Amino acid sequence: MQIGSAIGQDKVIMKQVMESASLPVVDYTWFFDNEYLEDKDTILKNIKNVGYPVVVKPATLGSSVGITLVKSEKDIESAIEEAISYDNKIVVEQAIDNLIEVNSSVLGNYEFQRVTPLEEVMGLDEILSYSDKYLGGSKGSKSASKGMASYRYAHLLIVDAIVFRQ
């Protein structure tokens, strides 16, 4: 795996790289599953300091697999358990109001690359699932994206970016 791809695939390392370049990063905390099992109270306190609502994510997966939007403290533990079922490294970040989600897939290597057109997801108030993004399950919104179902080739890297509305 190329170093750029490896860095980009780990959400915690990517945030640290962005911070070191003085780029804005939402407030977040991260932990390993064993740390959560050994000291749940400290982890929950750190999450509370980030401030609700938060997004709980497996740190090294893409395509919205295992991601949960948590609006209040009462739902945080089930969201963490969901994320832990996919990865042993978890990132919890502040949710952003009025965000724009932009999706693109990249297939290839150093000799050949194919990039799908950028896709801005419209008309949704919630985070998209894997099905929403790739199988056309757009949560019932007619203005939402049809997903990337037309790009049925195997993708090696998914690039998900969030652009902030000013």
Where are the regions a protein language model picked out?
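Short, contiguous strand/loop micro-motifs
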Residues: 1-2, 66, 163
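Active-site nucleotide/adenylate-binding loops and adjacent lid/helix of ATP-dependent enzymes
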Residues: 5-100, 110
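Phosphate-binding site of ATP-dependent enzymes
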Residues: 71-154, 158, 162-165
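Short, acidic/turn-prone active-site loops that include or flank metal/cofactor-
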Residues: 2-5, 122
